[in-house]
Amino acid sequence: MSGTRIEVPVDDGVLSGLDFGGQGPEVLLVHGSGHNAAVWTDVVAHLVEHCRPVAVDLRGHGQSALTSSTAEQYWRDLGAVVEALGWDRPVLVGHSTGGYAVTAAVAAGLVDAAALCVVDGMVLDDRDAATDAQAQWQNPQAAEELRETFRYGWRATEQQMFSYIEQYVREAESDWLNAGSRPELVRAVMRRSFLRGGDTLYERRPSLEEIAVVSAPDPRAPIYPSMDVYTHIRCPITFVLPARGSYAQRRDEVQTLVDAVANRHLVEISANHNVPMTRPAELAAIVGDVVRRHS
């Protein structure tokens, strides 16, 4: 299931997205850094009979030509997306950075969500620790490591792009992030991550400049990627914690976060960080349960 390409208006332009059809409760799917709307394709295949899923490419990602000039734009866009879709109290699902995006949008009052499902995208540090952690992405060495590992910002000819995509697919099964993903899904996600520019070259999204901007939020902002963001949220939250994910070693902290409020729920899953691509059926079952319980 590939979905129908759509464009969704936001304050300064449009975001690209995929409308997967279906009927029932509305579900907005938000990817993490370096991914795009196509990452949800296999999850949606198990969901679409029970709900109305739409996925968007965050600004700076996928086929959304818009880029960020402030650290908050990418999550503030979600309010405009929900309004443009004409939705009332959708379920928001976010993976990795997308998990913070949906959390921040609800915390800021931009979306009145029926529930949140946050997939390996928690924020567990206080403001001081979170500020220190964000600072690492302003380091030129960190940027170079991202460029070397993921080719973020790389500009390629069409032939170079397709050659790289096929190499990426061949190596996926031995890759720490993609092992277990369906090859055609890996190909689709990677192809969508290249945006053609006016000079006919294709840019691997996101750029390093995009990452630098979104990684420098104002520590004095009311909504910040630290654990106090959850004090602004009243709707139910389901946290999905993969056994080999980014927060596996901080399980006790996640459990404390869940135990603090009665309408929070923790679901553990045997997976690496890339849950939408490597464990789509299991994730769809979790999201489906959230939809049934809270829509």
Annotated model-derived regions:
Residues M1-V14:
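N-terminal cap/lid segment of alpha/beta-hydrolase-fold proteins
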Residues D11, V54-V93, T97, A107, ...:
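Active-site loop/oxyanion-hole signature of alpha/beta-hydrolase fold enzymes
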Residues V14-Q63:
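Conserved HGGG/HGGXW glycine-rich cap/lid loop of the alpha/beta-hydrolase fold
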Residues G99-L110, L116:
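Short glycine-enriched nucleophile-adjacent loop
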Residues A114-Y164:
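Flexible "cap/lid" loop of the alpha/beta hydrolase fold
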Residues D128, R151-V213:
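Conserved alpha/beta-hydrolase catalytic His-Asp/Glu region
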Residues F194-D259:
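Conserved serine/cysteine hydrolase catalytic core
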Residues A271-P280:
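Catalytic histidine-centered segment of alpha/beta-hydrolase-like enzymes
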